[in-house]
Curated annotation (Swiss-Prot):
Keyword Ribosomal protein listed: yes
Family membership noted in the UniProt record: Belongs to the bacterial ribosomal protein bL36 family.
Cellular component aspect of the GO annotation: cytoplasm; ribonucleoprotein complex; ribosome
Provenance organism: Syntrophomonas wolfei subsp. wolfei (strain DSM 2245B / Goettingen)
Designated name of the protein: Large ribosomal subunit protein bL36
Example GO BP: translation
Magnesium as UniProt keyword: no
Keywords: Ribonucleoprotein, Ribosomal protein
InterPro entries: Ribosomal_bL36, Ribosomal_bL36_sp
Highest rank taxon of the organism: Bacteria
Amino acid sequence: MKVKPSVKPICEKCKIIKRKGKVMVICENPKHKQVQG
């Protein structure tokens, strides 16, 4: 899980979602997981 000021999808399987007011990227590849904060 990477914490970044701006989250961007890395590959075509990355999905941007909102959870508890936080913007997150979830993906099949665990290295692509990101959270804004």
